[in-house]
Amino acid sequence: MIHVEQTFEENLFTIKGQIAHERVDSAGDTVTRGVRVARGMPLWSERLELQGKADLVEFRPEGAYPVEYKLGRRAGIHADLQLCAQALCLEEMLGVAVPRGAIFYHGLHRRYEVVIDQLLRDTTTRAIEAVRGMLRSQRLPPAPNDARCPSCSLLNACLPSVIGEPARVRGLQGALFRPLALSQEDGDA
């Protein structure tokens, strides 16, 4: 919704995420325990037509190691896909392999290492292509209406409980697009 319909709303969770990212989002390089650390590093890939920003990249002796910061807890593959996209950008930009990275969960104060294997690379590439197709078509996928919805900042714009019920949608569409003359005959006006 953010990119297709230019809709964004703040809520407690988006604000907490901004606060959690304040330090890591301040662009710049430091050296920690002999390792160069780049914060807020711009990333891009001409091949994948991506551009973005890494929360943090550690330049270890064995190579670049992206670290993505997340507010909540580990759930699903979405953060892994984001981290992999960053690794793919780093590989293209630097001409080096990026075989692993990490996701730091702020609430848990813990890092989880992610292996950037071929399956994750292929899944990430397919996800990028699917998003690109959605942006081109300007059509959003159906709202999932699941346990994540009550915490989502876009809940009131998305209305998953309404959109997720086809009969209700048809009824609303019928009422919305009923000609005025028919409405007046029915005594609705």
Which residues make up each language-model segment?
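Metal-dependent nuclease catalytic cores that hydrolyze phosphodiester bonds in DNA/RNA
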Residues: M1-A64, R73-R74, L176, D188-A189
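Short helix-capping/linker segments at secondary-structure and domain boundaries
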Residues: M1-Q6, E92-A97, P160-P166
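Residues that form generic nucleotide/phosphate-binding pockets
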Residues: T7, A127-A130, M134, A175, ...
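Alpha-helix initiation/capping motif
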Residues: N11, S45, G76-I77, D117, ...
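Metal-cofactor-dependent catalytic cores
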Residues: V24-D25, V31, D80, E92, ...
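Nucleic-acid nuclease catalytic cores
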Residues: W44-G52, V57-Q138, P142-N145, P150-N156
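Cysteine-cluster motifs in flexible loop/terminal segments that predominantly coordinate metals
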Residues: R139-E185
